[in-house]
Amino acid sequence: MEIVKIHKVDDFFENPDEVRAAILQMEFQPPTDTDNWHGVRVVPTDRVVAGVDLEEMIDEEVKFRIPNFTYDEMVLAYHITSEEIRNHFDVEFEQASKHFDGDACRIVGLIYLTPNPPKNCGTSFFDDEGNKVTELENVYNTMIIYPADILHGPTNPFGDTKENSRLTIVFFLKKYK
């Protein structure tokens, strides 16, 4: 099996509470019939939240961690996953939530924004046969960055309101050529 680097950045925002509060004020929407994700999301038109230019911060961190990587487009979303989404699957959640972020997507990442989350509610990574290889814990204000072609998914959903559920900023870096 190929060894792949997963980057972890602690204490990503200087003001995570303000960023979180601003995001929670937004109108989250469920997926459309053509979307391939579960939960609710906001796809922002303005990438500045609580005085933070998210695109610039993410871009700088990715370039620092993966110096030779270039991309054509960054897609951002604020994503909430609650305990309720378990009802959408007939199999164990961790098995059902495994996925690749394909097409033109090359690098993906997320920033955890729920304070004091339960244990075992981070992001799981799997080998090509679907066996769990590792899990990164959901730690408030931590960013993770990884290749889009790694099989992965949220380990466990939690919460029953947008304030106490799994809140993340997800980003997808796409290369079209």
Language model: regions and residue ranges:
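Non-heme Fe(II)/2-oxoglutarate
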Residues: M1-A96
